[in-house]
Amino acid sequence: MNKLIAILLLALSLPALAALEVAGVKFDDKAKVGAGDTVINGAGMRKRAFFKVYAIGLYLPQKAATAAEALNSKGAKRIAIVTLRDLTAEQFVDALIEALKNNHDEAAMKTLQPKVDQFRNTMLTIGNAPEKSVVHLDWLPETGTRLTFNGAQKGADIAGEDFYRALLRIWLGDKPAQDDLKEQLLGKTG
């Protein structure tokens, strides 16, 4: 009987054990992204100097151990970001675009530029992102990259998976925004 109770308690606690917590932010083990089901691949914290900037979780259709697997995974995806300090939309998007440029050559950036401009303009509609703001960058295979801020969609979806892969390279590229964060998003802990 005690063994049965222990097994039941373990089974009930498994979803809680599967969720990840970073800097007080809980990332659920699963997320519905459009019509697709995703699982948390990894989560970590972006830091600049001594400042905690945001907690981030990467959701994929299935777990990926390498950047290549994550970048090439088929189906819905989500980058979930929770700000850990007050940011302006301009600070936030300019830092993302700088990291985007670090992971793409001039020719690739020229091709992506109209989508980068659309993304920047959409991000700027946020205005300020107070601490604990939630930003989702979703890949919806049927429509494109969708930006939501605190649960509300911002702007039109950005067509083309090339742009979403470019966004992923900010954190998973050859020159990631932060090396240890790349490892954490790939499910490695250190």
Label the predicted regions.
Residues 13-15:
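N-terminal signal peptide c-region/cleavage motif recognized by signal peptidases
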Residues 19-73:
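N-terminal secretory signal peptides
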Residues 154-181:
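Flexible glycine-rich active-site/ligand-binding loops centered on an Asp-His dyad
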